[in-house]
Amino acid sequence: MSKLKEKREKAVVGIERASKEEAIELARVQIEKAFGKGSLIKMGESPVGQGIKSMSSGSIVLDEALGIGGYPRGRIIEIFGPESSGKTTLTLQAIAEVQKEGGIAAFIDAEHALDPVYAKALGVNVAELWLSQPDTGEQALEIAEHLIRSGGVDLIVVDSVAALTPKLEIDGEMGDSQIGLQARLMSKALRKITGILSKSNTCIMFINQIRMRIGVMFGNPETTTGGNALKFYSSLRLEVRKIEQVTRSGSSDDVIGNKIRVKIVKNKVAPPFRKVELIIYFGKGISREAGILDAAIKHNLIQKTGSWYSLGDNKLGQGRESVIEYLSKEVELANNLDKRLRKIIFNNFDQENDNFIEFKEDESE
């Protein structure tokens, strides 16, 4: 009797489910008539359910920390930090990577301060980069909206939120009080952008600055400009800070770059709060080779014994700087290491059964 009862209960559940699916299908037809085809679909039928596409940051250690192999497409990203901490360099490096893959990028220069010579040194094809230098914050955000709606742009960078000045403020007198204008502008614009962004493969990055809150006695007095809307709508928030200067080997005065720390304070596509350290060389950008070396040590492709670094039975060099310099000269080896690391990190690659890397002897020895 218990088996018969169980069968009857299953049959009733099946009938109920079938009737529910019929009801949902009727509702779906009505919704599509009112709002268009695709207004209501199962997640398995949608690109949303197929995983998030990404674009490389230009650094393998940052790509790993981001959790999906780079910056997510179809999302809003905020990169913030103190002045001269490497924020613009991160975005220009991302533009260079997008262009290498045949993508299209746009730079909305609200600060009117983009240096094409520096951008070119970082690998940006400045001849193919779309540039806008808007007069007002409204103009900048409307241009961004049009670019997203076009569906032809892979990456948009807005530099910076602090420079998105509302038209009312520009037209007003210097001493006029314009409380909350920029915050309201950002809130309205992001509400519009978020909806259309999710239907595209466009990634939009906002560079933001840090301000000090007056009268804060306890806790962190730092905040970002433009109100709270950007914090809310961003899928990814990166805090960038300079931690020390990088000097040439054997000299304490010859500064050749900065070491920065990138902390992922918000991540809606992977686990947050990861930290990575990157080296930015003046006039060259993020050191790809330093990132490859750090990742290779972490994943046991390169072994460190004392001050010596080795790949299998072959010694690469003594001292971190010398190995980074060696990898910068041995481009093929660096590329092979990068490819193998990406397989290990992002595809659960079995490193024991792969002979991908071919070691090239240093002819100078």
Curated annotation (Swiss-Prot):
PROSITE patterns attached to this UniProt entry: RECA_1, RECA_2, RECA_3
Matching InterPro entries: AAA+_ATPase, DNA_recomb/repair_RecA, DNA_recomb/repair_RecA_CS, P-loop_NTPase, RecA-like_C, RecA-like_N, RecA_ATP-bd, RecA_C_sf
Keywords for the protein's UniProt record, in alphabetical order: ATP-binding, Cytoplasm, DNA damage, DNA recombination, DNA repair, DNA-binding, Nucleotide-binding, SOS response
One BP term from GO: DNA repair
Compartments reported by the entry: Cytoplasm
One Pfam family in the UniProt entry: RecA
The keyword DNA repair belongs to this UniProt entry's keyword annotation: yes
Family matches, as SMART domains: AAA (SM00382)
GO cellular component: cytosol
A GO MF label: ATP-dependent activity, acting on DNA
Keyword 4Fe-4S: no
Chain positions recorded as ATP binding sites: G81, P82, E83, S84, S85, G86, K87, T88
Family affiliation: Belongs to the RecA family.
UniProt cross-references to NCBIfam families, sorted A to Z: tigrfam_recA
Known function: Can catalyze the hydrolysis of ATP in the presence of single-stranded DNA, the ATP-dependent uptake of single-stranded DNA by duplex DNA, and the ATP-dependent hybridization of homologous single-stranded DNAs. It interacts with LexA causing its activation and leading to its autocatalytic cleavage.
Record protein name field: Protein RecA
Organism: Borreliella burgdorferi (strain ATCC 35210 / DSM 4680 / CIP 102532 / B31)
